[in-house]
């Protein structure tokens, strides 16, 4: 019924928002929030492909892409070929959805980077390349993007 939304004019402003939650007041807010809130992006998946360095200390900013795929084996091959030709600043992991709060999602892709701007620029450059255009053309009949999100880690159960 509710969500927390920040509007940011640029990538640097988005990145500064994360600092709010590192302060004691931000941590207290999150603790209170978790007593009355239910996650909207609830779900879980099994990682099936990984590319690059998945170090969230170096690459704390995430792009999440939810997709519905009709031929998982074919899409995985197309995605692998595309990722092998891309120059990622961080990592990309494709997950097969195990249970979901996202309507009709079968897979999701998490791409990490050192900044929001680097994520956006690298993704744009990769998709605009010849390999990116080939990937998009070949994947068009078997994959539908259902939603995308820009996120940053506030807390991790591993810490």
PLM features: residue spans?
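Short S/T/G/P-rich N-terminal loop/turn motif that feeds into the first structured element of a domain
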Residues: 1-159
